[in-house]
Amino acid sequence: MTAPELRAPAGHPQEPPARSSPAQALSSYHHFPTSDQERWYQETGSLCSRFLEAGQYGLHQQYQFMFFFMHHLIPALGPYPQKWRSTISRSGLPIEFSLNFQKGSHRLLRIGFEPVNFLSGSSQDPFNRIPIADLLAQLARLQLRGFDTQCFQQLLTRFQLSLDEVRQLPPDDQPLKSQGAFGFDFNPDGAILVKGYVFPYLKAKAAGVPVATLIAESVRAIDADRNQFMHAFSLINDYMQESTGYNEYTFLSCDLVEMSRQRVKIYGAHTEVTWAKIAEMWTLGGRLIEEPEIMEGLARLKQIWSLLQIGEGSRAFKGGFDYGKASATDQIPSPIIWNYEISPGSSFPVPKFYLPVHGENDLRVARSLAQFWDSLGWSEHACAYPDMLQQLYPDLDVSRTSRLQSWISYSYTAKKGVYMSVYFHSQSTYLWEED
């Protein structure tokens, strides 16, 4: 197939649409109880609405999801301007929008989210424990389809700091303080799938045990009744022990569904951003090279890696944030992030890589993605994406920005083929100077 001609989108403010967006319409009939909520909605509401439109949701679903966003997420963003720096985004923003792309499939909006309140980071709650429990209880009252907290509650119990441990750890010595977070998948049928994330490093440090030990014991505990994860997990654990893959950036996630449908993911970050290291991690140090699915996925990953032209080398990243002029220059380049997904009864994990494009020219990244998608036969996504990126940020010129897209995630299975997501800067204000 011939690659589509990719022109530079217009980089100037566009005329407002003739009809109100769902974000505008809903806010016309809603009184925000605090100025903080009103300001957060100004920063994120219209942007969320544009992501829903880019995700090709029907108008009914757009209103439904915007209502959820307005009433359950906006109140949990905490004080404005933000004081708490969240682990979930490069700028420390406690919210992150992403769009998922597959061949012939509806684009799907996901929101990564760490709830925050006015106590977050204070002496009363230096590691932001309280809002996690509060939002979890609130979600349980909504009667979301298939919602089950059992696995996530077990992980929180094992990984969250106790009050005594909170008192032991000096918060100023910890660059990454988050204890937990959520992910919300907005499905085309109107269902919301919730994911939970836990960050074990602080617990391991307070308890005086290695991160690897804490994670292995926790996976065994949640799998004790069903024994559906341990075979694949043992492959991951052996490789990560061998390669020093466990570190302060290692974290876990699970779906908030009942245990028979549960998936567990082990995440990590590495500052060696090279193709050789990616290939090693993708194959678990060679343990999976006999699996055709793994090797086919690696070959296609090499294609997008080459197109993105990410500079290879060791990054100086130490857990810092990039939130404007005050950011340390050596903390702007991101590490590479990966996860290994374990499904019930799987013989090996499915790897996923998050290629770091924070700091790369946004239009060039968009064109590289479009070129790759066109090579896969994803003509609809390929033709639409560069203009879509500009429409998401109508007040910016995406040919002059370099922080709107933070990560490009990639995974591959024989059943579904290539599966990709783009993670975005998730507030209207652009915190950096344009190039």
From Swiss-Prot:
Region described as Disordered: 1-28
Binding site for brevianamide F: 96
Protein's name in the database: Deoxybrevianamide E synthase
GO molecular function: prenyltransferase activity
Pathway stated in the Swiss-Prot or TrEMBL entry: Alkaloid biosynthesis
Family: Belongs to the tryptophan dimethylallyltransferase family.
Annotated transmembrane regions: none
The organism of origin for this protein: Aspergillus versicolor
Oligomer status and interactors: Monomer.
Coiled-coil stretches: none
Enzyme Commission code: 2.5.1.109
A family per Pfam: Trp_DMAT
Record-linked CDD domains: PT-DMATS_CymD
Keyword Metal-binding: no
Function: Deoxybrevianamide E synthase; part of the gene cluster that mediates the biosynthesis of notoamide, a fungal indole alkaloid that belongs to a family of natural products containing a characteristic bicyclo[2.2.2]diazaoctane core. The first step of notoamide biosynthesis involves coupling of L-proline and L-tryptophan by the bimodular NRPS notE', to produce cyclo-L-tryptophan-L-proline called brevianamide F.
Catalytic reaction(s) noted: brevianamide F + dimethylallyl diphosphate = deoxybrevianamide E + diphosphate
NCBIfam families referenced in this protein's UniProt entry, alphabetically: arom_pren_DMATS
